[in-house]
Every structure is written in structure tokens, then in C-alpha cells.
Amino acid sequence: MKLGKILVPLDGSMLAEGALSNAVDLAEKYGATISLLRAAEAFTMPGADAVEAQATAVREAEEYLAAVVRRLANRVIGRVETHVGCGAAAAASVEAAAVQKADLIVMSTHGRSGLGRLVLGRVTESVLRGTTVPILVVRADHAPLDAPSGARQAERASHV
């Protein structure tokens, strides 16, 4: 199997970051590049500056990805790229997989039981339906690599 590029879509949640460990293991085994993606979709209230809101969303996505790269620095031997997509997460993931010529997409989903296990997460299912790139769906029962402290989320919440 040839794996040159592994796309890992992230939404800022620990659930999504649950896929990082698997992506890192595969990248090390196959010498692949990890491409971290964060979709930046600004939601604005009527009368708000949509351009400024989108610029803020992109900046926050870039800061988040930089923090993930710093946390991965002691674990990843190979190359890590970051990309910010604009728009909805599923569409940005499908587009990034095509543009970057990804060989694999690694995503996480809830570890549900019963009827819930029959349905993947909404974004994961949309990506699965929208791409021909193979997808490894990881059940995110565990913490991500070097979990963040939560300070960034607390700071963001204080500005609401």
C-alpha cells in the first residue's frame, strides 16, 4: 500500500483529535505526510461584518492548527502540513482531499452503541459520500495526543 498523504480533518474538538494517533502511526509506518485541515466557517448576525467574521474564523483556525502541530512535534517524525478550508466542514474536507491528492482520510466518530452505532457522524457520513478517497473512521473513545489544557476555550468563552 502506498500512502503519500493522509488528510486529517479537525474541528477543534477532542473527539476529532482522537484520529490523530492513528494518522501519526500510519504516517510513520508508510513515510506519509500528514495534512491537518480545519474548516473556517463564519456565522454572523444580521448587520455584522461578514468579511471580518470570516477573517477572524480563518485566523482562529490557523492558530488552532499551529497549536496541534506544536503538540505533535515530539511524536511526528515525518512532515506535517496545515490547511484552512472555507465553508462547511464536510465540503472543505472533500475539496481538500481532491486538491491535495490525499491517499487516505482519517476521521473520528462517536463510539455509540445500540441504534446510534448504525449512523456515523453527520460530517463523517457526508465526507464518505462525497469522496472516492478511502476513509479510516476511528472510534474516538480515547483522549487525543497531548490533550490541550483548555485555556484557549476558556479565553474564547470569556469574550462571548
Give residue ranges: language-model regions.
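Short beta-strand elements of ligand-binding domains
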Residues: S108, I135-R139
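General small-molecule cofactor/ligand-binding pocket signal
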Residues: L37, E81-G85, L136
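Glycine-rich, Arg-bearing micro-motifs that act as flexible, cationic patches
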Residues: L104-S126, P144-P148
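Short, structured coil segments at secondary-structure junctions
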Residues: V123, T131-T132
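Structural beta-alpha unit
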Residues: M1, L15, R70-I105, A143-V160
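Small/aliphatic-rich secondary-structure junction motif
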Residues: K2-D49, A140-A143, Q153-V160
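A short acidic, glycine-rich active-site loop
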Residues: E52-E63
